[in-house]
From Swiss-Prot:
Chain residues that bind Zn(2+) 2: 819, 893, 900, 903
Presence of keyword Cell membrane: no
Organism listed in the record: Streptococcus pyogenes serotype M4 (strain MGAS10750)
Reactions accelerated catalytically: RNA(n) + a ribonucleoside 5'-triphosphate = RNA(n+1) + diphosphate
Keywords: DNA-directed RNA polymerase, Magnesium, Metal-binding, Nucleotidyltransferase, Transcription, Transferase, Zinc
UniProt: Mg(2+) binding residues: 450, 452, 454
Record's protein name: DNA-directed RNA polymerase subunit beta'
Binding locations of Zn(2+) 1: 60, 62, 75, 78
Origin: domain of life: Bacteria
A Pfam family hit: RNA_pol_Rpb1_3
Function: DNA-dependent RNA polymerase catalyzes the transcription of DNA into RNA using the four ribonucleoside triphosphates as substrates.
SS bond partners: none
Cofactor needs: Mg(2+); Zn(2+)
InterPro entries hit by this protein: DNA-dir_RpoC_beta_prime, DNA-dir_RpoC_beta_prime_bact, RNA_pol_asu, RNA_pol_N, RNA_pol_Rpb1_1, RNA_pol_Rpb1_3, RNA_pol_Rpb1_3_sf, RNA_pol_Rpb1_4
Length: 1213
């Protein structure tokens, strides 16, 4: 028997009639389902126990044989086999059709596979199949054309003309079946190949299409006549159940209705044929049978759908697979799980980073089996049943057992929407009272959670392996860095930031200034007793902190700091320098010398000579966390984060910062600024009335004036603000709010957008402190509503984008250590005009070099080939003045079905080299999709009249890039490398002509008159360079340049959109996605290979096909790279399971069946669908078949290695 859980591949083909008979356990002859009195299935009906198996385990229908000991016996009275009732989910029946019936998928799909096989138009097919015309099958000696159509009348006329039996013509699916049987595949294929040598245009396209389908039949071993059914399989009854409702009525699956119609019509047809009924009646019945089978397979595909009660269309077999509610997406890719719960979340500020609070009653329910096992083991109860009763009664002893059980048993917490992998993390449960789950405040950022009523789901990993993986790979304390950019994702926010900001403030002349303390305890004592303030600048003996990395010159001295900073530094890791200034120099190089007293110096003099430092803000805390992580990795960092959190909360509470209306300052010269603006607007309008400017110019000038007025108020606000003002502190520290919120409270609200998106000329002059007038209030409501609707629309759009991205990249996994490629990618900083979008330093970090990098002046080798570039190395390379470096890149990786470690570089989420088995495709998709909601929806207009092209930005632009659509505002590109020799304007046609002189000839390009030029006369341009502003069409670029240029261009474009919105994403994520769009080629000339011209295929398959031919000395095939949008790329994937579960399910399956496609189960989705463990991470073959080995000597493993590999030390198969 086949081991159901271990198979290499899965194939789908057309089912031959003999195959369907071999599946079947009997013929369904009657349309009855169950008897309304006995509620037992009817004999020979759709639920018959003889065919499909017994309804009760180990019991035949009449009850003669009961119990498992009769297993396998067939009852002599009722004919039912004694077996499990589960077989009713797997045993099929069949219906012998009295007339052949065409399968709607193959006749109606686009393109019609039947039509292509027979070289007939779908319309002609429809007329024949539905009995509207005859088709000539064999003309014999008559001048009739084979496959030509005859109407009823023409048929009779021709019969009279040529005599009966002089030619054969039929109608209905039977005729089509006869024609399909006559197709000689080999001959037709040879003929078409011959035709292709000379054909062109429309004729060639059609020939290529036909050749594709005929070749598919030829190679797969499917016979064309199997597209017409003589026998119809009946799916198992438990997959189309009938259930009794409370009121005694029945709810049945729609499929039963559809099968019933087929059986009724089939039986009626059989009776008519027995009675030798007139031809027209039989014909009508055959047509009705055809329609009934069509409705069963795909209701509504042709004509009006068959409806049930309340004119609701019935769900056919195709609908069971399609869409979000279909079998694929509803049951195979997303299942509901047991051992899960859901509750509102509340903040748990006392929790450690790896803990979460679980309510007692929830925990006892989730861990019930574990608790019951312990109760029995401790002999509090004799058996499981008694243990269960104990738990349900709420016996006092169960709580102690529960405490033991949950110790070291992690649980998973998930918050919807799960936009990236940090949306599910593992925690150790801590039992709490109440009914809300408690969440650690620092993980909120990763979950995007807040405590205004959010809910979260909790899941329990059951098996030992699942617990080990949760603990080692998913524990929240391990997820310090964000996979999308490698920056810390657990930065303190709000109160924590505010507390640490307040703590590290400095103030001149506060009580206790100039005191000198011997150590921290003395300073704290002075502060607690009111002798010194947190912000007072005081001295402390350096020797009281001997473990800090002081310079030799700083030891044994007194250092000037504040009491607050002494407390702040006390929680820092010991090896980190003493932080006195909030900057990177202090963090990486050590405390500046100016804070140390020379022997005999007066401390007050030194204090007076020092400037007052700004406090530590959110950004600085982020840098400290990143540095801590870089030096000490996860364990120390997560402990430090907890200390930072506690300190922040404690001091924000002590500071008691509050906000009242009096805290909003009044700007002294607001009236002057506004009067000046009114005056300026009046002048502009006067100039317009005199005809000195156009209306567009006037509009731009007026809105600019008001914008400048708002900025002037903002500037004044910043100048006059008091650093001790609580609102200013909140804003400045990065805890909440920004300058624009502040200026709306204290300055003016400024210009608002009108419903059409255009900015209104009338600004809102009031601020919120003064209060708005009714008209102003009305003006501002529109913006608020638009904000809400935009967000809602954006969320849906962004979610769909993520789904498509995941689908196209889900099979990209790190598959090997090094692919050994000799290609690389030359990179330099990404610029947009003069602005730098992404620096070279950022692009180099965490990548491997392809060639060694030399110092441009000294020629010294800075780093060898194939070396990992660290953060420090990247800085060193850039500081040396290097402008471009050749690195290993995903674009040039030679690994099949994935990427190798060296081409990928470091895993941004851990900061270490990526592991074999990491699902980098999915991570890339999440990293690009997750910030999608932060991107704007709008299409920007480039300032009024300046240009006629709207440049798309934000989310729509990202979609445009990844779907490889023709961009809005397309740039004209040159196909010639050379110099721009002339740009002439032609007023009559409103165009400009650009002439580029190349080596081989002159290129002439017509450009719209209004387009902004990117080149001037004398400029040197490369092939594919843009002559005008705008986006280049990537497909056009691919024709002019090569694949790598297109990949580099798309990468830069994606980065421009995200960086302009302040979102950072690692290059490698975009590289993974873009590579997936360019993994196919189209065969142009097959040479001596047996490839077909026009075929789309994977680059690796194409090179394989050529390899053998080249070795044997033949002519290799030629091809052209193809750029596909992500949706198209997902549907063109080699895995039909993955494609079918994505979109257009019926089309994908139709095509796969004809080709007899094999799915080798390489990606993640395919394996989830068939219920196998995914081939990534610990599910990879090399980590699974492991031989345990004894350790000879005691090995010491450092912390970074104690991750997945330590548990799964793997032997490759």
């Amino acid at each position: 028997m086949v081991d159901v859980n271990r198979f290499k591949s899965m194939q789908i083909t057309l089912a031959s009639p003999s195959k369907v008979r071999s599946w079947s356990y009997g013929e369904v002859k009657k349309p009855e389902t169950i008897n309304y009195r006995t509620l037992k299935p009817e004999r020979e009906g759709l639920f018959d126990e003889v065919i499909f198996g017994p309804t009760k385990d180990w019991e035949c229908a009449c009850g003669k044989y009961k119990r498992i000991r009769y297993k396998g016996i067939v009852c002599d009275r009722c004919g039912v086999e004694v077996t499990r009732a589960k077989v009713r989910r797997e045993r099929m029946g069949h219906i012998e059709l009295k007339a052949p019936v065409s399968h709607i998928w193959y006749f109606k799909g686009i393109p019609s596979r039947m039509g292509l096989t027979l070289d007939m138009s779908p319309r002609a097919l429809e007329e024949v199949i539905y009995f509207a015309a005859y088709v000539v099958i064999d003309p014999k000696d008559t001048p009739l054309e084979p496959k030509s159509l005859l109407t009823e009348r023409e048929y009779r006329e021709k019969l009279q003309e040529y005599g009966h039996g002089s030619f054969v013509a039929k109608m209905g699916a039977e005729a089509i079946q006869d024609l399909l049987k006559r197709v000689d595949l080999a001959a037709e294929i040879a003929e078409l190949k011959e035709e292709l040598k000379s054909a062109s245009g429309q004729k060639r396209i059609k020939a290529v299409r036909r050749l594709d389908v005929l070749d598919a039949f030829n190679k797969s071993g499917n016979k064309p006549e199997w597209m017409v059914l003589n026998i119809l399989p009946v799916i198992p009854p438990d997959l189309r159940p009938m259930v009794q409702l409370d009121g005694g009525r029945f709810a049945a699956s729609d499929l039963n209705d559809l099968y019933r119609r087929v059986i009724n019509r089939n039986n009626r047809l059989a009776r008519l044929l027995e009675l030798n009924a007139p031809g027209i009646i039989v014909q009508n019945e055959k047509r009705m049978l055809q329609e009934a089978v069509d409705a069963l397979i795909d209701n509504g595909r042709r004509g009006r759908p068959i409806t049930g009660p309340g004119s609701r269309p019935l769900k056919s077999l195709s609908h069971m697979l399609k869409g979000k509610q279909g079998r694929f997406r509803q049951n195979l890719l997303g299942k509901r799980v047991d051992f899960s719960g859901r509750s509102v979340i509340a903040v748990g500020p006392t929790l450690k980073m790896y803990q979460c609070g679980v309510p007692r009653e929830m925990a006892i329910e989730l861990f019930k089996p574990f608790v019951m096992r312990e109760i029995v083991a401790k002999e509090y109860a004799g058996n499981v049943k008694a243990a269960k009763r104990m738990v349900e009664r709420g016996d006092e002893r169960i709580w102690d057992i529960l405490e033991e059980v949950i110790k070291e048993h992690p649980v998973l917490l998930n918050r919807a929407p799960t936009l990236h992998r940090l949306g599910i993390q593992a925690f150790e449960p801590v039992l709490i009272d109440g009914k809300a789950l408690r969440l650690h405040p620092l993980v909120c950022e990763a979950y995007n959670a807040d405590f205004d009523g959010d809910q979260m789901a909790i899941h329990v990993p059951l098996s030992e392996e699942a617990q080990a993986e949760a603990r080692l790979l998913m524990l929240a304390a391990e997820h310090i860095l964000n996979p999308k950019d490698g920056k810390p994702v657990v930065t303190p926010s709000q109160d924590m930031v505010l507390g640490n900001y307040y703590l590290t403030m400095e103030d001149a002349g506060r009580e206790g200034e100039g005191m000198i303390f011997k150590d921290k305890d003395e300073a704290v004592m002075a502060y607690r007793n009111g002798y010194a303030h947190l912000h007072s600048r005081v001295g402390i003996a350096v020797d009281s902190m001997p473990n800090k990395p002081w310079k030799d010159s700083q030891r044994h001295k007194i250092m000037v700091t504040t009491v607050g900073k002494i407390l702040f530094n006390d929680i820092m890791p010991e090896d980190l320098p003493y932080l006195q200034e909030p900057n990177n120099a202090n963090l990486t190089e050590g405390t500046p010398d100016k804070y140390f007293l020379e022997p005999g110096q007066d401390i007050q003099e030194v204090i007076d000579g020092l400037e007052i430092n700004v406090p530590f803000k959110k950004k600085n805390l982020g840098n400290i966390i990143a540095e801590t992580f870089k030096r000490f990795r996860t364990t120390e960092t997560s402990a430090f984060l907890d200390r930072l959190k506690d300190l922040g909360y404690y001091h924000s509470t002590l500071a008691g910062l509050t906000v009242g209306i009096a805290d909003i300052p009044v700007i002294d010269n607001k009236a002057e600024i506004i009067d000046a603006a009114h005056h300026r607007v009046e002048e502009i309008n006067k100039a317009f009335r005199r005809g000195l400017m156009t209306d567009d110019d006037r509009y731009v000038a007026v809105t600019t004036t008001w914008r400048e007025a708002k900025e002037a108020l903002e500037k004044r606000l910043i100048e006059t603000q008091d650093p001790k003002n609580p609102i200013v502190m909140m804003m400045d520290s990065g805890a909440r709010g920004n300058i624009s919120n502040f200026s709306q409270l204290a300055g003016m609200r400024g210009l608002m957008a009108a419903p059409n998106g255009r900015i209104m000329e009338l600004p809102i002059l009031s601020n919120f402190r003064e209060g708005l007038s009714v008209l102003e209030m009305f003006f501002s409501t529109h913006g608020a509503r638009k904000g809400m609707t935009d967000t809602a629309l954006k969320t849906a759009d962004s979610g769909y984008l993520t789904r498509r991205l995941v689908d196209v990249a889900q099979d990209v996994i790190i598959r090997e250590d090094d692919c050994g490629t000799d290609r690389g990618l030359l990179i330099r900083a990404i610029t947009d005009g003069k602005e730098v979008t992404e620096t070279l330093e950022e692009r180099l970090q965490g990548r491997y070099t392809r060639k060694s990098v030399k110092h441009p002046e000294t020629g010294e080798v800075l780093i060898g080939a194939d070396q990992l570039i660290t953060e420090d190395m990247a800085r060193k390379i850039v500081d040396a003045g290097v402008e471009e470096v050749t690195i290993r890149s995903v674009f040039t990786c030679a690994t099949r079905h994935g990427v190798c470690r060296h081409c990928y570089g470091i895993n941004l989420a851990t900061g270490d080299a990526v592991e074999v088995g990491e699902a980098v495709g999915t991570i890339a998709a999440q990293s690009i999709g997750e910030p999608g909601t932060q991107l704007t929806m709008r299409t920007f207009h480039t300032g009024g009249v300046a240009s006629n092209t709207d440049i798309t930005q934000g989310l729509p632009r990202i979609q445009e890039i990844f779907e490889a659509r023709n961009p809005k505002g397309e740039a004209v590109i040159t196909e010639v490398k050379g110099n721009v020799v002339e740009i002439e304007e032609d007023a009559s046609t409103r165009t400009k002509k650009v002439y580029v002189q190349g080596k081989t000839g002159m290129g002439e390009y017509v450009v719209p008159f209004t387009a902004r030029m990117k080149v001037e006369v004398g400029d040197e341009v490369n092939r594919g360079a843009a002559l005008t502003e705008g986006s280049i069409q990537p497909k056009r670029l691919l024709e002019v340049r090569d694949t790598l240029s297109v990949e580099t261009y798309l990468l830069a474009e994606v980065q421009k959109v995200y960086r302009s919105q302040g979102v950072e994403i690692g290059d490698k994520h975009v590289e993974v996605m873009v590579r997936q769009m360019l993994r196919k080629v189209r065969v142009m000339d097959p040479g001596d290979t047996d490839l077909l011209p026009g075929t789309l295929m994977d680059i690796s398959d194409f090179t394989d096909a050529n390899k053998d031919i080249v070795i044997s000395g033949g002519i290799p095939a030629t091809s052209r790279p193809v750029l596909m949008g992500i949706t198209k790329a997902s549907l063109e994937t080699n895995s039909f399971l993955s494609a079918a579960s994505f979109q257009e399910t019926t089309r994908v399956l139709t095509d796969a069946a004809i080709r007899g496609k094999k799915d080798h189960l390489l990606g993640l989705k395919e394996n989830v669908i068939i219920g196998k463990i995914i081939p990534a991470g610990t599910g990879m073959a090399r980590y699974r078949n492991i031989e345990p080995q004894a350790m000879n000597e005691i090995e010491v493993i450092d912390h970074t290695e104690v991750s997945a590999e330590a548990v799964f030390t793997a032997e490759a198969e």
